[in-house]
From Swiss-Prot:
CDD domains: GGCT_like. GO terms for cellular component: cytoplasm; cytosol; trans-Golgi network. The active site is at 115 (proton acceptor). Catalyzes the cleavage of glutathione into 5-oxo-L-proline and a Cys-Gly dipeptide. Acts specifically on glutathione, but not on other gamma-glutamyl peptides. Glutathione depletion is an important factor for apoptosis initiation and execution. Acts as a pro-apoptotic component of the unfolded protein response pathway by mediating the pro-apoptotic effects of the ATF4-ATF3-DDIT3/CHOP cascade. This is Glutathione-specific gamma-glutamylcyclotransferase 1. It is an enzyme of class 4 (lyase). Keywords: Apoptosis, Cytoplasm, Golgi apparatus, Lyase, Neurogenesis, Notch signaling pathway, Unfolded protein response. The keyword Plastid does not apply. It is found in: Cytoplasm, Cytosol; Golgi apparatus, trans-Golgi network. Its main location: cytoplasm. Interacts with NOTCH1 (via extracellular region). The keyword Lyase applies. GO terms for molecular function: gamma-glutamylcyclotransferase activity; glutathione specific gamma-glutamylcyclotransferase activity; Notch binding.
């Protein structure tokens, strides 16, 4: 599978953020940084890290509301990828990665291209609850696409989102692969991990897929 990273002909990168007090730190190791991933980062971080933990953040729901014209779509046919929506009752599962020392600046430089320059995401501090120790929360950095970024598509019926996902492909592969890998991750998290929005899109895709391509091609995509 192609990596979710910059291709050789990508636009010039902006200056990578310099690690400082603006990024969330934890008392146990002030030189370490935790980065929370809830989309493609859960299966393809593509940066060096010291530790990773599955868990969740509260107060946010995951939505396929961000457009993607590079990794999972094109300028003519933007794909649909996830962002976080503030939701008092929401809970989003993902993976937090710990980076230390030289890993910090390298990870931030890489993610600045992948998530900010190419994806339109901004950074936000969140509180991450590890699955194996929810009573020991960690401060983490998350990449969130807000309505102010030019690639933001906003809400749409799950069936419409599914149709768009089935039709789009980018430098990192088919948009459907992105959806199904995220769904696979949620299943591995166990029954306590619920995402009705994601599940509804997967169900809609399952209904529509045979109409988009012959059976053998449909099975190959799944």
């Amino acid at each position: 599978m192609k990596q979710e990273s910059a291709a050789p002909n990508t636009p010039p990168t902006s200056q990578s953020p310099t690690p400082s007090a603006q990024f969330p730190r934890n008392d146990g190791d002030p030189q370490a940084l935790w980065i929370f991933g809830y989309g493609s980062l859960v299966w393809r971080p593509d940066f060096a890290y010291s530790d990773s933990r599955v868990g969740f953040v509260r107060g946010y729901s995951r939505r396929f509301w961000q457009g993607d014209t590079f990794h999972r779509g094109s300028d003519k046919m933007p794909g649909r990828v996830v962002t976080l929506l503030e939701d008092h009752e929401g809970c989003t599962w993902g993976v937090a990665y710990q980076v230390q020392g030289e890993q910090v600046s390298k990870a931030l430089k890489y993610l600045n291209v992948r998530e900010a320059v190419l994806g339109g995401y901004d950074t936000k501090e969140v509180t991450f609850y590890p699955q194996d120790a929810p009573d020991q929360p960690l401060k983490a950095l998350a990449y969130v696409a807000t309505p102010q970024n030019p690639g933001y598509l906003g809400p749409a019926p799950e069936e419409a989102i599914a149709t768009q996902i089935l039709a789009c492909r980018g430098f990192s592969g088919h948009n459907l692969e992105y959806l199904l890998r995220l769904a696979d991750f949620m299943q591995l998290c166990g029954p306590q991990a619920q995402d009705e929005h994601l599940a509804a899109i997967v169900d809609a895709v399952g209904t529509m897929l045979p109409c988009f391509c012959p059976t053998e091609q449909a099975l190959a995509l799944v």
